[in-house]
Every structure is written in structure tokens, then in C-alpha cells.
Regions:
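A composition-driven surface/loop motif
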Residues: 1-414
Length: 414
């Protein structure tokens, strides 16, 4: 019954493709499916196709005969699909099509464990056309790759729905990007979680745009790399990497909405992926952006908090250790002053002796960020004593977990 529910055809004219190691079967008007050969099913015309089942070293090959004349989308409705490639060939290969659209329901898992057979078409999902994960996606798309990009397009990529989880950091001997578009890469409504051994989100020639959704990135190289522009107008973005946001010379950063935290260990914002200083146009930012260059490295669990008076206006936690931070929120103003806390400890910077972070414009950079001597500490669960234990001549303070609180001078007894 569960399989029948997952495989329910969403549109009346859909062709149903059932994947299996014992053989791929096709139901419906198969005029758009030219062939089933072994473990490969070839789609040669635009239209709607439902896909379910489990297969090892199988492939969905989209090869529209004349994509100029037949420019409508090939729409794949992934409904509980599990595909594994041990040969390096893409699980879904958009070799020739006007557009490739994926709508996910249930849990869909795509995995590869070997280097690409053909570098030109490397990727667990690859297309020479636009690739879209549609807003009608209600399920999950999990992609794990040891050596190849998870989603790659020679044109645009749009992630408009669903829960997309990508891990390309499973093989310490190789680097693989998570999501790479030659042209525009856009996220508008999807929840995207990335763990990448190389770059997280990448546009090789154009822009990366995040309009809405939730984006969380942990990258070995650039968390987000854009050639021409990085536009963020909504959503929640946590982007951590050896490098955070990188742009080419004369690139544009435009943050007009959303809550944003980008962190890095190698280079501050304003450097390209090679560590060369570049000119970035930030005039398109309409909400406060704070750039923090710390004097020392901090752990990934150390939250970055900005307060105005006693009110917290920004607080986010990185996905990776960091030295450089770019933070933005609609609650931040380019003309206000704030106090900064890192892991609950008040900070100061080169231009202040009292811990005041005074904004002097929409984007303000602070260098030499370090702990403020004698500054306040925000109590946390670990530093708040909930019990005092008397033993002989000594008193020990413990927290809610029963652990001894090691900093009694900053205890809050409750």
C-alpha cells in the first residue's frame, strides 16, 4: 500500500518508469521512451515521467531527438527512487533536452562511488540544459558522491522546493563540488544542506541568487562562489568554508533580505578563491552587513551574536571553524552601534577600546576582533549553576547536567 501511495501518478498523461535490478519496466504511452536497454532507460521526448524503484548501476538517460523543435521540459517525478553508480556514470544524465525538471516525493537517494567515466558529463545529476527541482517537491533528494559534482548543469540550476541534502565529502583523497552551474544558480524555496570537499554553491560564469529557503553549507573550499554577482533577498543562509563568499573582480554583492552568516578560515571577504584581493561592488546591499576579521580562530560551535542594548538582533552559529565573518540581517542598520559576543564573550576591535561596534555604512568592516578585557559574558547552560554542593570545607557549583562549573567568578545562581 505504501509503494502504491508513493507511486501515484501526479498527471494523467505520465509514463511510469519502474527501476529494478531485475529489469526496468515502463507503463503507459511509451512513445517518449525510445528504449530500455539493460539498466538504462532512454527518454527521447518531452513530457511527464514518474520514476520509482531501486537499481544499481542503472541510468535515466534524457536524449530528446530534437530539443530545438521539442523544447518543452522533460519532467521526472521521483517517487522513492534509490540509484547507485559504481562506474562513475551519472544516475540521471540530461544529454539533450530543452529543460529537465525534477519533482521529488518520498525519500530519493542517489549515490556514486567512482570517478566519472566522461569528465564532460561528470555529476550524479548532469544536464546540458536547465535543471530545476520544482516548487511542487514535497520530499527529499539525498545525493552522496565521493568524486563527482552532485548536481551539475552547463546552463542554469534552480532549486525551488523540497529538502535537498548533498554530501561530496566522503573521500579524503578527492575534491568534488556540491552544486555547479555554468550560468545562473538560484535557490527559491528549497531547503538545501551541503557538505562538500570542494565548493558548495558555484556559478562558473554568472550569478548565484538566493531568494528564499534555508541554505546550510560546510565546504572544503568556497562556500559560495559566483562569477558576476551574489544576490541574497531572503531566507536563512549559513555558509562556512575555508573561504566563505568569493566573487571575481568587479563582482557584485547585493544583500537585500534574509539572515546571512558567511564564515572562512583562509581569506576575508574581498578576496577571490585564489586569495587575490578583488574589487567588489556592495552598493546593492540595502540591509546592514557586518564584516568581522578576528585576531584568532574560533570553533564552529561558537555563535556570533550582535546586540543593541540588551536586545539580541542577530545570532547564528557557523558550520565550521572560522577567522573571518560576514553577517547580515534586516534587523541590522548601517547607522547603529552594537555589541558583539562570540561564544557568549564580549568582543572589541582595533577601532574601539570599549567594545562598541559602530556602523559607518551599510557594510562596515571591523579588524582585529578579539575578547574585550573585563567585558561581560553571556551566561550559557554550561556556566549557569543550578546546584551548590557542600563537602567539608569547600563548595562546588554544578550545572544542570551535573558537571562542575569551572568559572565561578561569572556564575549566575538560579
Amino acid at each position: 500500500r505504501l509503494r502504491q501511495m508513493i507511486a501515484t501518478v501526479p498527471v494523467s498523461d505520465a509514463i511510469a518508469i519502474h527501476l529494478s535490478d531485475s529489469g526496468i519496466t515502463v507503463e503507459g504511452d511509451t512513445k517518449g521512451v525510445t528504449a530500455v536497454s539493460g539498466k538504462t532507460v532512454t527518454i527521447s521526448a518531452s513530457g511527464n515521467y514518474t520514476v520509482d524503484g531501486t537499481i544499481t548501476d542503472g541510468q535515466i538517460l534524457v536524449n530528446v531527438v530534437d530539443p530545438t523543435a521539442d523544447s518543452d521540459a522533460v519532467s521526472l517525478y521521483l517517487q522513492g527512487v534509490t540509484m547507485t553508480s559504481s562506474t562513475g556514470a551519472p544516475c540521471i544524465l540530461g544529454q539533450s533536452a530543452g529543460k529537465l525538471k525534477l519533482t521529488c516525493s518520498g525519500i530519493n537517494t542517489l549515490t556514486d562511488t567512482a570517478a566519472a567515466v566522461n569528465a564532460d558529463t561528470s555529476g550524479v545529476i548532469y544536464g546540458d540544459c536547465d535543471i530545476t527541482v520544482t516548487k511542487n517537491s514535497t520530499g527529499t533528494l539525498n545525493i552522496t558522491s565521493s568524486m563527482n559534482t552532485a548536481i551539475r548543469s552547463k546552463d542554469d540550476i534552480k532549486l525551488n522546493g523540497g529538502d535537498i541534502s548533498i554530501n561530496t565529502d566522503v573521500d579524503a583523497t578527492s575534491d568534488a563540488d556540491a552544486i555547479r552551474a555554468n550560468n545562473t544558480l538560484e535557490i527559491d524555496g528549497a531547503s538545501v544542506t551541503v557538505t562538500s570537499s570542494a565548493d558548495g554553491l558555484k556559478s562558473a560564469k554568472e550569478d548565484v541568487s538566493i531568494l528564499s529557503g534555508k541554505v546550510s553549507i560546510k565546504a572544503g573550499n568556497d562556500a559560495v562562489q559566483a562569477a558576476t554577482a551574489l544576490n541574497i533577498s531572503g531566507g536563512t543562509v549559513t555558509a562556512s568554508g575555508d573561504r566563505g563568499f568569493t566573487l571575481d573582480e568587479n563582482g557584485v554583492l547585493a544583500i537585500t533580505g534574509g539572515d546571512v552568516l558567511a564564515t572562512a578560515t583562509d581569506y576575508a571577504f574581498g578576496m577571490d578563491s585564489a586569495g587575490t584581493a578583488v574589487t567588489v561592488n556592495t552598493s546593492g546591499c540595502t540591509q546592514g552587513v557586518v564584516q568581522l576579521d578576528y585576531a584568532a580562530e574560533w570553533k564552529k560551535s561558537n555563535a556570533v551574536t550582535l546586540k543593541k542594548g540588551s536586545s539580541t538582533v542577530f545570532e547564528m552559529t557557523p558550520n565550521k571553524k572560522y577567522t573571518y565573518v560576514l553577517a547580515s540581517s534586516g534587523s541590522l542598520s548601517g547607522s547603529d552601534s552594537y555589541t558583539l559576543y562570540t561564544d557568549g564573550t564580549q568582543m572589541t576591535h582595533d577601532g574601539s577600546d570599549n567594545g562598541t561596534f559602530a556602523m559607518t555604512g551599510t557594510l562596515t568592516k571591523f579588524t582585529g576582533v578579539q575578547e574585550l578585557a573585563g567585558g561581560s559574558v553571556t551566561p550559557t547552560d554550561d556556566t549557569v549553576a543550578t546546584a551548590l554542593v557542600y563537602s567539608g570545607s569547600s563548595v562546588t557549583a554544578t550545572n544542570a547536567s551535573g558537571s562542575v562549573v569551572s568559572n565561578p567568578s561569572n556564575l549566575t545562581i538560579s
